[in-house]
Amino acid sequence: YCSVLTGLRRKSILMRMEKIEATAAARLTTMPTRDDLRLAVETRGPIDAPAVLFAHGFGQSRHAWARAAEGLAAHGWHAVTFDARGHGDSGRLADGRYALEQFVDDLLTVARSLAAPPVLVGASMGGLLGLVAAGETRPDPFRALVLVDITPRWESEGVERMLDFMRAHPHGFASLDDAADAVAAYLPQRRRRKDRYELAQLLHRGEDGRLRWHWDPALLDTVAREGERHQQRLLKAARNIDVPVLLVSGGRSDIVSDATVAEFLQAVPHARHVEIPHATHTLAGDDNAAFAVAIEPFLTTLDPDAVPASHAHAAVQRGLP
């Protein structure tokens, strides 16, 4: 009897695991922009469930959010990730003249393709695009907003350090190990072996056989040209946001500081703030588990129509608020 029961339990566990894997499996498609580029869009989870839309940071791609998207899809969310223009598998501008408005419009295009306004989770650049879209667009394009280590103002030295890293290898890398060495020097807190697959998603092999970052180098000119001049606009947009907001910051971030967080919370008094003490600017990648713990209570406080029943039930079972 015991052996039969053990076998049934094992079969039940395997069936649940297969169901979770099938639910979290990614579906890749493309979506046209207003100016006829194609955006690479990846979805996970039931398409009729409440949606979470992930927007990646500058120089990243949709793969930066893969683990977080898989986790939410397994809990019943419709998780959507996409490559911003000029990044990953999305289209690039022939003239290389990227502008903030284009990125915001692309974000709104993806959001409006969904059945209802999604929760937006935006890291760095993705969070800034979310701020502009949420603060300058009515009706509200998002059900709620999660900003990941970004505020309307930022510490310039941290941004310059990031840009220096991105400019440092114009001729690419001979191997994945060489690229890993470069990232390890810039992000020593990362566990190198664990990140090799994710690192490979950020690179592409050119005709000369060398590996280069999977984004348009012309984007660096855009940041240098437009960067800080948008900060007042971003702060004004933040003051206009009336949906629930969560700011998740890294305690070791060199881009977000106590001062920039305080200014943001004064501008958006209803916003909540969670700090992950050991994390840097790349906090979701530094510790995805800690990031998930930080955002889950916020997601469960949204109204019932915005939270999958399976996610809310799981949260209650674990004693989350």
Where are these regions (language model features)?
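Catalytic histidine neighborhood in serine/cysteine hydrolases
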Residues: 268-281
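Conserved serine/cysteine hydrolase catalytic core
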Residues: 207-266, 275
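Conserved alpha/beta-hydrolase catalytic His-Asp/Glu region
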Residues: 174-229
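Catalytic histidine-centered segment of alpha/beta-hydrolase-like enzymes
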Residues: 279-292
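A short loop-to-beta-strand scaffold at the N-terminal edge of the catalytic core in hydrolase folds
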Residues: 35-44
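Conserved hydrolase catalytic core segment
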Residues: 116-156
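Conserved HGGG/HGGXW glycine-rich cap/lid loop of the alpha/beta-hydrolase fold
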Residues: 43-89, 303
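Active-site loop/oxyanion-hole signature of alpha/beta-hydrolase fold enzymes
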Residues: 37, 69, 73-74, 80, ...
